[in-house]
Amino acid sequence: MPTGTHRPTRRFPLVWVFAAVTALLMIAVAGYAFLSSPAAVPVFADGTSSAAPVAASPAPVQTSKSAKPTPKPSKSPKKVSFWGDTSTIPAAKNVLTVKILNRTNGKYPDSKVYWSFNGQTHSIAEQPYFDMPANSAGRMYFYLGSPTGQYKDFIEFTVGPDVFNGNTTRVDGFGLKLALRLHAHDGYDTQVGEDQATFAEDRSATFQRFQNEVPTEFKHLATVQAPYYIPAPGSDSAFRTGGQYANYFTSYAQANGVNEPTSNIFGCAGSMAGNPNMCAALNRHVAGQSQQSDPSQYYKAAPANYYAKFWHDHAINHLAYGFPYDDVAGQSSFISHGDPQYLLVAVGW
């Protein structure tokens, strides 16, 4: 073709164009009808189809920027019995097994709680048990901090071939909170000593409570040797001859036919050593009364041994050795039983 010329444009008849457009529209409509028909989804023999169900969109969760997940409640720690697990106490080869318990409420570790008996001294960490032989008698001492420390106290006992006799004592004074639990092979089980409420409180709280609960004449006992000791009134200079309270019991004692100094009445010494009933009656202020064996009548009026009363008030079953003849009418912390299995000694702060 010569340069500069144009190829003529081929024109289709208008009727052809119209026919083609019409055909395309018909195909589109037919396809839409097919896809919209249930027949378009294959149905299987069990009645199910291949079409996946359309799940409804979940409702949007309302959140807050300040909202925090609720923490799961923590489990309460398992409460440990005051006396601990007794099932692990080894059987005695001698008369009974003694186990010493640290009940200082975390004040001292086991390595700083000591016991001493018959030439042996150990911390609880070293040796928590002692196999008590027969014919043992005397005192077992307990110390906090060091085996020669000033925080100390003791229990008293005698052990026969098949029997235990013993007690805690406040006759001389208070040094440490102590409690005993004696268990025998026949099922006998008893406890004496300071109650658990007293063990639970701090030492300073016990000293303060003593001052709060006793009359004026006795308050100074909690300060004269603090923080180590609360002496019994019979050994305190204020109640001895020449002391501020030397005549505390004088008039009351004389009215009941007793001519002994106040310190001898507290300590059941002199003529009182041979007259336990009278000594107990004077200390409890029930001398001359008909109900001298009724504990509900004790310490109702002054003069009385309010030092002893305090330890009774805060002892297990209100039993304590507050003065030498506190065993009159069964009010002491003395325990005794045959065929003993073990003795637990709780040492507190």
Language-model segment annotations:
Residues P2-H6, P13-Q62, A67-W349:
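Extracellular low-complexity, O-glycosylation-prone Ser/Thr/Pro/Gly-rich "stalks"
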